[in-house]
From Swiss-Prot:
The modification Phosphothreonine is found at residue 55. 2-oxoglutarate binds at residues 102, 141, 156-158, 174, 248, 257. It comes from the Eukaryota. Keywords: Dioxygenase, Iron, Metal-binding, Oxidoreductase, Phosphoprotein. 2-oxoglutarate(2OG)-dependent dioxygenase that catalyzes the conversion of 2-oxoglutarate to succinate and CO(2) in an iron-dependent manner. However, does not couple 2OG turnover to the hydroxylation of acyl-coenzyme A derivatives, implying that it is not directly involved in phytanoyl coenzyme-A metabolism. Does not show detectable activity towards fatty acid CoA thioesters. Its EC number is 1.14.11.-. The lineage of its organism: Eukaryota, Metazoa, Chordata, Craniata, Vertebrata. InterPro entries: Phytyl_CoA_dOase-like. This is Phytanoyl-CoA dioxygenase domain-containing protein 1. Fe cation binds at residues 156, 158, 246. It comes from Mus musculus (Mouse). The keyword Ligase does not apply. Belongs to the PhyH family. PHYHD1 subfamily.
Length: 291
């Protein structure tokens, strides 16, 4: 059943995250993985777009904010790569399918397989059971977490990058395409951390000025013992509150940890910050989730 029970809703409200095991079938996961394989096989990335995507905090401005390729990807399907996968001439040092960190940020809009999954009746029923009245899809990503060098994702709150007024209007759906275990970089959360507001925001600069983005505020030094791991079997879905603190470790294993993620916003009574890096465009306004 796609709808949350009262006890599940209560747990999500208390913790800021919730695991729903077996939400998607193996066949649905296979369909998404096969489609991603086709997209990667057809990938033709110009040399100037071979941008190393880093999840290390101290490199974020350089690799994300200053790169037009990233900042203009909100309404497109684009490829972002792991560090060290190109030589100095921009040639692949590893097989191309092993080089990608993620594909973003509009699979939900431009690909029929991912559009169907994103707007599936059971996803709609799940989100309705959370009480969202007018949810819109703001972004989607396919994350690879490659074996041996799939990068660490530092502790963060999604609302740092996807800020709304009031807060509490962003919801992440994290779908495991493969088993996500301790060995290959599963998610970790600080339960209850979604009740403390947002400590930092990434702001997009005006197009005619300086670096692409900057940060306002700073994150506290979250103690490592506050985090709890959340292993997820293939097909599981994790609900993620926009302000809950979460992270993942580098993948040192022999197995990838692929996931499809979607971020939603409750549009009713909500202002999407004009300072967010991601903005709706005339070509792609944020599409309603509900049919």
């Amino acid at each position: 059943m796609a709808c949350l029970s009262p006890s599940q809703l209560k747990k999500f409200q208390e913790d800021g995250f919730l695991l729903l095991e077996g939400f998607f079938t193996a066949d649905e996961c296979v369909a998404m993985q096969q489609r991603i394989g086709e997209i990667v096989a057809e990938m033709d990335v110009p040399l100037h777009c071979r941008t190393e995507f880093s999840t290390q905090e101290d490199e974020q401005l350089q690799t994300q904010g200053k790169t037009d390729y990233f900042l203009s990807s909100g309404d497109k399907i684009r490829f972002f790569f792991e560090k060290g996968v190109f030589d100095e001439k921009g040639n692949f040092l590893v097989p191309p399918e092993k080089s990608i960190n993620k594909i973003g940020h509009a699979l939900h809009a431009h690909d029929p397989v991912f559009r169907s999954i994103t707007h599936s009746p059971k996803v709609q029923a799940l989100v309705r059971s959370l009480g969202l009245q007018m949810p819109v899809v703001v972004q989607s990503m396919y994350i690879f977490k490659q074996p041996h060098f799939g990068g660490e994702v530092s502790p963060h709150q999604d609302a740092t990058f996807l800020y709304t007024e009031p807060l509490g209007r962003v919801l992440g759906l994290w779908i495991a395409m493969e088993d996500a275990m301790l060995e290959n970089g599963c998610l970790w959360f600080i339960p209850g951390s979604h009740t403390r507001g947002v400590s930092r925001r990434m702001i997009r600069a005006p197009s005619d000025s300086g670096p692409g983005t900057s940060f306002l505020g700073s994150d506290p030094a979250w103690a490592s013992n506050l985090f709890v791991p959340l292993p997820v079997r293939r097909g599981g879905l994790v609900l993620i509150h926009g302000e809950v603190v979460h992270k993942s470790e580098q993948n040192h294993s022999d197995h990838s940890r692929q996931a499809y993620t979607v971020h939603l916003m409750e549009a009713a009574g909500t202002v999407w910050s004009p300072g967010n890096w991601l903005q709706p465009t005339p070509e792609l306004p944020f599409p309603p989730l509900y049919s």
